[in-house]
From Swiss-Prot:
This is Capsid protein. Its main location: virion. One of its GO terms (cellular component) is T=3 icosahedral viral capsid. SUPFAM superfamilies: Positive stranded ssRNA viruses. It comes from Cacao yellow mosaic virus.
Amino acid sequence: MSSDLILAPQPLINTKASELPSQSGSPPPEIVYPFQFTIASLGVEPTADFVSIAAQAAITAYTSLYRHAILTDLQAIIHPNGYAPAFPTSVALAWVPYNSTATAAKILDVFGGQEFCVGGSINSTSPIIVPCPLTNINPIIKDSVTYTDTPKLLIYSTAPSYSTSATCTLTIRGKVRLHSPLLSSSSS
Protein backbone atom coordinates (compact mmCIF):
# COMPACT_ATOMS: atom_id res chain seq x y z
CA MET A 1 0.00 0.00 0.00
CA SER A 2 1.34 3.42 -0.90
CA SER A 3 2.25 5.90 1.81
CA ASP A 4 0.26 8.55 -0.10
CA LEU A 5 -3.01 7.00 1.09
CA ILE A 6 -4.88 7.74 4.29
CA LEU A 7 -6.51 4.71 5.92
CA ALA A 8 -9.40 5.67 8.23
CA PRO A 9 -11.10 2.52 9.58
CA GLN A 10 -14.30 2.79 11.59
CA PRO A 11 -14.03 1.56 15.18
CA LEU A 12 -15.58 -1.86 15.72
CA ILE A 13 -18.41 -2.75 18.05
CA ASN A 14 -18.98 -6.19 19.52
CA THR A 15 -21.65 -7.58 17.21
CA LYS A 16 -21.98 -10.40 14.71
CA ALA A 17 -23.76 -10.43 11.35
CA SER A 18 -26.52 -12.96 10.68
CA GLU A 19 -25.78 -15.90 8.43
CA LEU A 20 -27.03 -19.40 7.74
CA PRO A 21 -24.82 -22.31 8.80
CA SER A 22 -22.85 -23.97 6.00
CA GLN A 23 -24.01 -27.27 4.59
CA SER A 24 -21.84 -30.30 5.19
CA GLY A 25 -19.81 -31.78 2.35
CA SER A 26 -17.15 -30.43 0.06
CA PRO A 27 -17.43 -26.72 -0.73
CA PRO A 28 -18.43 -25.73 -4.28
CA PRO A 29 -15.91 -24.11 -6.62
CA GLU A 30 -15.78 -20.36 -6.19
CA ILE A 31 -14.30 -17.31 -7.83
CA VAL A 32 -13.33 -13.99 -6.29
CA TYR A 33 -14.34 -11.04 -8.45
CA PRO A 34 -12.81 -7.57 -7.88
CA PHE A 35 -14.97 -4.51 -8.52
CA GLN A 36 -14.80 -0.73 -8.40
CA PHE A 37 -17.43 1.83 -9.32
CA THR A 38 -18.03 5.55 -8.91
CA ILE A 39 -20.76 6.63 -6.53
CA ALA A 40 -20.64 10.43 -6.73
CA SER A 41 -18.69 13.52 -7.67
CA LEU A 42 -18.72 15.75 -4.60
CA GLY A 43 -18.05 19.43 -3.97
CA VAL A 44 -20.50 21.19 -6.29
CA GLU A 45 -23.76 20.67 -4.38
CA PRO A 46 -24.48 19.52 -0.84
CA THR A 47 -25.13 15.76 -0.79
CA ALA A 48 -27.01 13.60 1.73
CA ASP A 49 -27.54 10.06 0.48
CA PHE A 50 -26.95 6.38 1.09
CA VAL A 51 -25.76 3.49 -1.08
CA SER A 52 -26.94 -0.10 -0.67
CA ILE A 53 -24.07 -2.29 -1.85
CA ALA A 54 -26.28 -5.34 -2.50
CA ALA A 55 -28.53 -3.29 -4.81
CA GLN A 56 -25.80 -1.65 -6.93
CA ALA A 57 -26.21 -2.43 -10.63
CA ALA A 58 -22.44 -2.81 -11.01
CA ILE A 59 -22.55 -5.73 -8.55
CA THR A 60 -25.91 -7.30 -9.40
CA ALA A 61 -24.83 -7.60 -13.05
CA TYR A 62 -22.45 -10.44 -12.22
CA THR A 63 -23.95 -11.77 -8.98
CA SER A 64 -27.12 -12.55 -10.96
CA LEU A 65 -25.30 -15.55 -12.46
CA TYR A 66 -24.67 -17.13 -9.04
CA ARG A 67 -26.77 -18.30 -6.10
CA HIS A 68 -24.35 -17.02 -3.46
CA ALA A 69 -22.24 -13.85 -3.19
CA ILE A 70 -20.16 -12.87 -0.16
CA LEU A 71 -18.09 -9.70 0.15
CA THR A 72 -14.51 -10.40 1.22
CA ASP A 73 -13.32 -6.79 1.02
CA LEU A 74 -15.21 -3.50 0.80
CA GLN A 75 -13.94 0.08 0.92
CA ALA A 76 -15.15 3.59 0.23
CA ILE A 77 -12.44 5.82 -1.26
CA ILE A 78 -12.48 9.60 -1.49
CA HIS A 79 -10.29 10.75 -4.41
CA PRO A 80 -9.46 14.48 -4.28
CA ASN A 81 -8.78 16.14 -7.63
CA GLY A 82 -6.96 19.28 -8.78
CA TYR A 83 -9.75 21.59 -7.58
CA ALA A 84 -9.55 20.31 -3.98
CA PRO A 85 -6.78 22.66 -2.73
CA ALA A 86 -8.73 25.75 -3.86
CA PHE A 87 -12.20 24.51 -2.87
CA PRO A 88 -12.08 22.43 0.34
CA THR A 89 -15.06 20.12 0.82
CA SER A 90 -16.27 18.31 3.93
CA VAL A 91 -17.20 14.66 3.37
CA ALA A 92 -18.74 12.50 6.10
CA LEU A 93 -19.05 8.71 5.73
CA ALA A 94 -20.31 5.83 7.85
CA TRP A 95 -20.79 2.13 7.10
CA VAL A 96 -23.98 0.77 8.69
CA PRO A 97 -26.21 -2.29 8.20
CA TYR A 98 -28.91 -1.70 5.58
CA ASN A 99 -31.67 -1.97 8.21
CA SER A 100 -30.12 0.83 10.30
CA THR A 101 -32.33 3.88 10.84
CA ALA A 102 -29.31 6.21 10.78
CA THR A 103 -29.52 9.01 8.23
CA ALA A 104 -26.87 10.77 6.16
CA ALA A 105 -27.57 14.11 7.85
CA LYS A 106 -26.66 12.61 11.25
CA ILE A 107 -23.50 10.64 10.34
CA LEU A 108 -21.50 12.00 13.27
CA ASP A 109 -24.20 10.67 15.62
CA VAL A 110 -23.45 7.14 14.33
CA PHE A 111 -20.76 5.18 16.20
CA GLY A 112 -17.77 5.19 13.86
CA GLY A 113 -19.06 7.97 11.59
CA GLN A 114 -16.21 10.14 10.32
CA GLU A 115 -15.89 13.53 8.64
CA PHE A 116 -12.97 14.54 6.44
CA CYS A 117 -11.89 17.88 5.04
CA VAL A 118 -10.84 17.18 1.47
CA GLY A 119 -8.54 19.82 0.03
CA GLY A 120 -7.53 23.22 1.33
CA SER A 121 -4.01 24.43 2.00
CA ILE A 122 -3.28 22.22 5.02
CA ASN A 123 -5.81 19.43 4.66
CA SER A 124 -5.88 16.15 2.80
CA THR A 125 -5.27 15.95 -0.92
CA SER A 126 -4.40 12.22 -0.66
CA PRO A 127 -6.99 9.50 -1.29
CA ILE A 128 -8.83 8.54 1.90
CA ILE A 129 -9.82 4.89 2.33
CA VAL A 130 -12.65 3.97 4.71
CA PRO A 131 -12.90 0.16 4.97
CA CYS A 132 -16.25 -1.45 5.75
CA PRO A 133 -16.12 -3.45 9.01
CA LEU A 134 -17.33 -6.73 7.46
CA THR A 135 -17.02 -8.46 10.84
CA ASN A 136 -19.84 -6.24 12.13
CA ILE A 137 -21.95 -5.87 8.98
CA ASN A 138 -23.27 -8.90 7.10
CA PRO A 139 -21.02 -9.54 4.07
CA ILE A 140 -23.51 -11.94 2.43
CA ILE A 141 -25.17 -9.93 -0.35
CA LYS A 142 -26.84 -12.89 -2.09
CA ASP A 143 -28.01 -16.19 -0.61
CA SER A 144 -30.98 -18.53 -0.44
CA VAL A 145 -32.61 -16.00 1.87
CA THR A 146 -32.63 -12.20 1.83
CA TYR A 147 -30.67 -10.43 4.56
CA THR A 148 -31.61 -6.96 5.79
CA ASP A 149 -28.26 -6.18 7.42
CA THR A 150 -26.01 -6.00 4.34
CA PRO A 151 -23.61 -3.02 3.96
CA LYS A 152 -24.96 0.49 3.44
CA LEU A 153 -22.78 3.58 3.10
CA LEU A 154 -24.11 6.87 4.44
CA ILE A 155 -22.74 9.93 2.62
CA TYR A 156 -22.95 13.59 3.59
CA SER A 157 -21.01 16.32 1.84
CA THR A 158 -20.99 20.08 1.91
CA ALA A 159 -19.89 22.25 -0.99
CA PRO A 160 -18.27 25.67 -1.08
CA SER A 161 -20.75 28.20 -2.47
CA TYR A 162 -18.17 29.42 -4.97
CA SER A 163 -17.21 26.03 -6.45
CA THR A 164 -18.41 25.15 -9.94
CA SER A 165 -16.48 21.89 -10.35
CA ALA A 166 -16.36 18.71 -8.31
CA THR A 167 -13.46 18.61 -5.86
CA CYS A 168 -13.44 14.87 -5.22
CA THR A 169 -14.92 11.60 -6.39
CA LEU A 170 -16.30 8.87 -4.14
CA THR A 171 -15.77 5.29 -5.29
CA ILE A 172 -16.54 1.87 -3.85
CA ARG A 173 -14.17 -1.01 -4.39
CA GLY A 174 -13.82 -4.50 -3.06
CA LYS A 175 -13.94 -8.19 -3.81
CA VAL A 176 -16.88 -10.56 -3.83
CA ARG A 177 -16.67 -14.36 -3.60
CA LEU A 178 -19.17 -16.06 -5.93
CA HIS A 179 -20.17 -19.72 -5.93
CA SER A 180 -22.93 -22.10 -7.01
CA PRO A 181 -23.87 -21.01 -10.54
CA LEU A 182 -27.55 -20.25 -10.98
CA LEU A 183 -29.02 -22.77 -13.38
CA SER A 184 -31.09 -21.12 -16.07
CA SER A 185 -32.24 -21.69 -19.61
CA SER A 186 -29.56 -21.30 -22.26
CA SER A 187 -32.09 -20.33 -24.93
CA SER A 188 -33.46 -16.84 -25.21
